[in-house]
């Protein structure tokens, strides 16, 4: 792989809650535990143990990543804060996995890189 472009955002996805008494066995197929942290740019998120992000939850996450990359505000796409503890920021959002088991907090951080499309990197 030749990653030649520096992404304009980096993303952190933290596991902040797991239903079922916090135990993943019998609940979370991916094995997510409170405190697990996934990171990514444009690639798929990977946690501190090198394990990939839940494929079902990725269906929810990807549109949020694109919202940020497109200059959008995560507060404007609806939802709520399951923990009731989200900073008032356009770059932070909590969401629950499709199975209703794991609660994640997405945080985006601007890297200083230019947008892939408006920065002149994309070529047809």
What are these regions (language model features)?
Residues 26-48:
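Short, flexible N-terminal segments of the mature chain
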Residues 49-72:
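Short, compositionally biased
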Residues 17-19, 46, 110-112:
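Beta-strand elements of well-folded, non-transmembrane domains
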Residues 2-19:
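Short, basic/aromatic beta-hairpin or loop at an interaction surface
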Residues 5-7, 34, 98:
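Solvent-exposed loop and beta-edge segments used for protein-protein assembly and interaction
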Residues 10-14, 39, 103-105:
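Beta-strand secondary-structure signal
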Residues 72-124:
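Short, compact, well-ordered microdomains
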Residues 20-26:
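Short N-terminal binding/cap micro-motifs at the start of the first secondary-structure element
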């Amino acid at each position: 792989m030749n990653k030649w472009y520096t992404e304009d955002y980096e993303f952190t996805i933290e596991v902040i809650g797991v239903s079922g008494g916090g135990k993943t066995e019998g609940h979370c197929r991916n094995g997510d535990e409170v405190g697990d942290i996934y990171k990514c740019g444009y690639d798929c998120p990977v946690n501190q143990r090198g394990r990939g992000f839940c494929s079902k939850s990725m269906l929810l996450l990807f549109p949020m990543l694109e919202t940020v990359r497109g200059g959008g505000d995560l507060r404007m796409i609806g939802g709520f804060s399951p923990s009731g503890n989200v900073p008032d920021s356009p770059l932070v959002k909590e969401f629950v996995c499709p199975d209703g088991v794991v609660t994640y907090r997405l945080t985006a951080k601007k890297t200083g890189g230019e947008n892939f499309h408006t920065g002149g990197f994309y070529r047809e």
